Amino acid sequence: MKRASLSLAMATLLMSSAVLAAAPAVTESMKAAVADSGRPEADTKRDENRKPAEMLAFAGITPGKVVVDLLPGGGYFTRIFAKAVGPNGRVYAYFGTQYDERLKSQGRDPDNLMADLKRTYKNLGVIHGPLTGFVTPQPVDVVWTSLNYHDIHNRSYNMDIHDVNKAIFKSLKPGGFYVILDHTAAESAGDDVTETLHRIKVSTVKKEAEAAGFRLVAEGDALHHPGDDGTKRVFENDIRGKTNQFMLKFQKPRR
């Protein structure tokens, strides 16, 4: 019994070590994607805080990969992904129906946001559809979402996050990755924090993704900001653009 308990403890320790392993190396092709001259100045000014090269390395986005940028906003990461996967790869900017409506209410038409990108990057496709019916033209290697996962929980979206995650799970290739970045909420916060503060608890995301069949394989701390304790709205002037953010990488089992 003691030997079995010891073996279980060692296995747990090894698994934890793998999840918290050192950050993967940034390759020259990743650096080149970030240095792409086609990126607008408004995007490059945000690089210091968003650390795009490190994000490419964490997600494992390399030439030839098929990637979905889920709820892509103005396309900050979409451009970088399209350059990173190269002509033999493919990137899909996936706009959920409710997300489309929200952008339009802000005077930001999704098709207009992507028009310039589609002219520049021939490997880019744009998808409009319900998140609970998430589907892609081909199986994908990586589904990425940054600073939007919490929104899916809000009343305005009126959907079940479990249905969304199950649909994403189905779209991925066996061994594919689901990468989620978002504003960290204090673990003592209530579930309504997604709407009041625009944050979400790390434990909530882990529980939801694992319930859909994913396995947590990596966590990153490149976007950690100790000055943000997770109790303020992310739009407060003293933390805007410098919020503490978690990085979680989940994998669909290979079999």
Where are these regions (language model features)?
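A short SAM/SAH-binding and catalytic strip from SAM-dependent methyltransferases
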Residues: 141-159
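Class I SAM-dependent methyltransferase Rossmann-like catalytic core
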Residues: 30-58, 62
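A short acidic, Gly/Pro-enriched loop at the edge of an enzyme's catalytic core
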Residues: 121, 134-144
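Conserved Class I S-adenosyl-L-methionine
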Residues: 191-217
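A short glycine-rich, Lys/Arg-flanked "PGG" loop and its adjoining helix->strand segment in the class I
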Residues: 82-83, 159-174
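Conserved beta-strand signature within the Rossmann-like core of class I S-adenosyl-L-methionine
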Residues: 175-183
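Conserved class I S-adenosyl-L-methionine
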Residues: 64-73
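Core SAM-dependent methyltransferase catalytic element
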Residues: 227-255
